[in-house]
């Protein structure tokens, strides 16, 4: 999946063929598959021209029905027709039974407490059901694109935990499909609008689907999407709009004690009415009863708005809470992206615009925007993007390191290392009693920080005030499969830590990489000399710092003549260290070390004498 084929400067990487990859929005209500073709990203329709696949699976004695076919039978066979299986992913049977919602399915429990659906074909788990939804989407993609897929990107809610994410991966694995990445749904929506390459700042993703409402507040910083906060309501969605319409129609028609078939018919008509009122001021609702009686009524947009106003208000309240959790205001939100078919409802768009103070982004079909973002990401990950559009790397093109004393670079992860990768090194304090340490993360092949690319800075506080060199700080560099670098510094004795995230590839072109590599070779000899000089200067500063502290504490162990000689030699070290002769600095340090050997021995003897003062030989 090489995105960037690294070659030495002056050499060219071999060209590669277009690789087939797709993005899949595995939704609660509907699922879609999208791909980039001839530079255009679009969802792929089935043979009937339908883009969305209802996320419904029905098990019969002889077959497994998926999508619209399963949906047609859901009223007649609800027990074996599994809808919204995404809600069951990663949840235990105990959690499901403890919830308020009841389900028509017969459940069994697996050995590890997970739910199993009892069907005419035996017991199946949510992962297997999800795989059945993925199966026709994969088949559709391979037929449309004309070949076998090399990978897929599947979207998941930002709040999905590890178990739910792993379940999604396992569903694809059952089909033998390689998952290039699981992508957060709000991030996918932002990518679809190209917000990942635009102005840095805060973005809100308002996602009102069929069964759930999610609001995500993201911050875009140097090409990295950080999820600041998520909120919403897992039991509020467009389905609730449908149920309110259904209740209204039942009341007008004075229908009571209805069976499951009529209930399903009413619900289907409610959805049609809701969709019609998106563009019309009013529409006619119509159902035919089992005895052939035809019932009709006119439903106006004003009536519908009144029915759903309280629910829309609840979503805005969730937005307000989530913004507060994120620590941002509506004025700071640059864009609001609308996701989910229910955001087509005019009242929803009006209320969102009123709350955020600006029109939301709606130019991309809200049902398809997540799948489109996933497809864009899949195209990048599989290696089809030209180098000028570089976003993600499968190897690290330039070394990553940390600045040490003297402006030196300590490389932690070397260039051309395959990602994902994690590397750790230990560092220590320079001064006695040092309680904080500033970290400067850099990128490049040169020996000095001044010649490398600065990536990020952060500070670790709360280091125990120990002698210089006594504290142990473990610095871990971790680069994930997206090329996102996380640097964590931890003081080992206390566990106190600090971290930062940055995308090393952000704003870095292939030309710049080649230039930096050429410079590292061109100036290699000079850089080594400059590094040796800086190292000796740092050592001189360390020795002088340590000796000043020792003299301040135990200077009375020296007579005036001895003190004068040491002071003179220290002054010489300081003077030579200000120059540019590394060998001369080394010799000056060695002379000072030799001259202070006796002083060091006296300090040791004095420390032992003080430690054992007042103790008898038997106590030692």
From Swiss-Prot:
The keyword ATP-binding applies. InterPro entries: ATPase_NBD, Heat_shock_70_CS, HSP70_C_sf, HSP70_peptide-bd_sf, Hsp_70_fam, ISC_FeS_clus_asmbl_HscA. It comes from the Bacteria. One of its GO terms (molecular function) is unfolded protein binding. Pfam families: HSP70. GO terms for biological process: iron-sulfur cluster assembly. Keywords: ATP-binding, Chaperone, Nucleotide-binding. Signal peptide: none annotated. Gene3D superfamilies: 1.20.1270.10, 3.30.420.40, Actin, Chain A, domain 4, Substrate Binding Domain Of DNAk, Chain A, domain 1. Coiled coil: none annotated. Belongs to the heat shock protein 70 family. Chaperone involved in the maturation of iron-sulfur cluster-containing proteins. Has a low intrinsic ATPase activity which is markedly stimulated by HscB. This is Chaperone protein HscA homolog. It comes from Shewanella baltica (strain OS185). The gene is hscA.
